[in-house]
Amino acid sequence: MNKFVYLFMFNLNEIRNFSIFITLISMILFSCKKNSNTVKPELHKSYFDVTQGRFIEYEVLEINHDENASIQHDTLRYFLKIQIEDTILDNLGRINNKYVRYKKSNLNDPWMISDIWTIIIDGNNAEIVEENQRTVKMKFPVDTYTNWNATIFTNLSSLDCFYEDIHKARTINGLSFDSTVKVNQGSDRNLIRFYNKFERYAKGIGMIEKYYKDLNISNFDTLNISSGKELYF
């Protein structure tokens, strides 16, 4: 009798252990299946549209400051067109698109080629090579946790960027955009320098606004400028 009870208890323990084992395996398999069906997060790469043939036109205000120049605050107004054109291999063997910049002084003038740069989305980086400087204009995903050094591939000083006003509707110069994002490129003001830089992008379009102000000043006074540049699209 005792032997029977002992054997019964032993077999019961084996059954319990086996049941626990099966349960654990089922949980693992369910977890793997659940993870495999998880929807990948949206990266929002359409903010940086590299579709061939796409173009955007801007009206630009550019001010160059130099207290030693004959024109100390040289102000230029012109029109700028950015067009994505045919593909080209870069020095890393990557397929880029030509990023062609056209300019004209007056609205009725013909467009003239000013610069030919290149543009690419490589992994999670949106890059433009301008004046032989490879700059990371955006990084994906577009969210509050993403930040990056735009000049990481250059010898220039670090330019730390992050996103603000994410997926906000906005109207600029009478044009309405359903979803925009601001790329903050830094701002500061001290005794001898003031700068504020940002770009704004619209989904399915690209850059719709640029604000660049970098001035060498005196005694915190942003009107007492010795040198610097302002650029507004």
How would you name each of these model-derived features?
Residues 33-233:
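Conserved functional acidic sites
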Residues 1-4, 232:
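Generic detector of intrinsically disordered, low-complexity segments in short proteins
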Residues 28-31:
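C-terminal motif of bacterial Sec signal peptides marking the signal peptidase cleavage site
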Residues 3-20:
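Bacterial N-terminal signal peptides that target proteins for export
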Residues 20-21, 193:
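Residue-level preference for beta-strand/loop junctions
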